[in-house]
A protein has these predicted regions:
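Eukaryote-specific detector of the first structured module of a protein
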Residues: 60, 79-89
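Parallel beta-helix/beta-solenoid
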Residues: 91-99, 116-118
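C-terminal region of N-terminal signal peptides and the immediate post-cleavage residues
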Residues: 25-40
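N-terminal export and membrane-targeting signals
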Residues: 1-21
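Extracellular beta-rich repeat passengers
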Residues: 39-54, 59, 64-78, 107-124, ...
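General secondary-structure propensity
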Residues: 24-25, 135
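Beta-strand repeat architectures
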Residues: 87, 91-92, 108-112
Length: 260
């Protein structure tokens, strides 16, 4: 599920026109929407190859351009140690971006960061990795075709994910199970649309032996009559330690999960 730590502290374990902007949200809005049907994915305004990682400080508005890896960033599988398309400095915001195929290692947040209305069309190694800081925010957007994880949490702190759509994935969020330096981590999921495929998938994977806490609210799961999507998977590092809600680590109730 995760992989051994590396010196780069990496383990395997988001303005176009108003019309384009509205289309990109579909059912997943920055605030206030309740997912009811599969999200409408945005149409890119342009496509741009990226052969070396783009560093972001402050705010970068991608204008709904599709960025995809080329050259050294042409990897899109689960090979470890890939570089990201974007690397965000502490406090940076990336918004209105589509990451296409090849996706390399998506986005790295080196500190606190905000990903707003970012869409991953075909997740590479991971969609985003949170490496340092205390608070990370993912709001709006979506991800699909993740052979393993969407969001990898290696650093400390809390990741807040809201108004997000995910499909064709194995794990939406994973707290690192084998990083060389470990932390107690928190993740909050709110207003998440999940499309099942009939295969086993997990919304969150947390390390209960480290005191991790996952809070799930307003989760809508589509196309999962067999209940293959596990809301909260517990681990002792990399060893499975059960599933389901409790009063300590996996904070949700049946009323927080809607199946359609």
């Amino acid at each position: 599920m995760t992989s051994a730590a590396r010196p780069r502290v990496r383990t395997r374990a988001l303005t176009g026109t108003l019309a384009a902007f509205s289309l990109s949200f579909g059912m997943i809005m920055i605030s206030g929407a309740t997912p009811a049907s599969a999200a409408t994915w945005p149409t890119p305004t342009n496509s741009q190859p990226v052969s070396s990682t783009i560093s972001v400080s402050g705010t970068r508005d991608g204008g709904m351009v599709r960025y995809y890896g080329s050259g050294a960033l042409a990897g899109d599988d689960q090979e470890e140690g890939q570089d990201p398309i974007f690397k965000l400095a502490n406090g940076a915001t990336l918004k209105n971006v589509i990451i296409g195929k090849p996706g390399a290692d998506g986005i790295h947040c080196e500190g606190n960061c905000t990903l707003q209305n970012v869409w991953w069309e075909d997740v590479g190694e991971d969609a985003a990795t949170f490496r340092g800081g205390s608070t990370y925010t993912v709001t709006g957007g979506g991800a699909k075709k993740a052979a393993d994880k969407v969001f990898q949490h290696n650093g400390p702190g809390t990741l807040n994910i809201s108004n997000f759509a995910v499909s064709e994935f194995k794990t939406l969020y994973r707290s690192c199970g084998d990083c060389s330096t470990q932390y107690t981590r928190k993740v909050n999921l709110n207003n998440i649309e999940v499309t099942g495929t009939g295969s086993t998938a997990r919304l969150v994977g947390i390390n209960v032996n480290r005191g991790d806490v996952a809070t799930l609210r307003k989760i809508t799961i589509l196309n999962d009559s067999g209940r293959k999507v596990v809301p909260c998977q517990k681990y002792n590092n990399n060893d499975s330690a059960g599933t389901g809600p409790d009063s300590t680590n996996c904070l949700y109730s049946s009323s927080d999960i809607t199946y359609r």
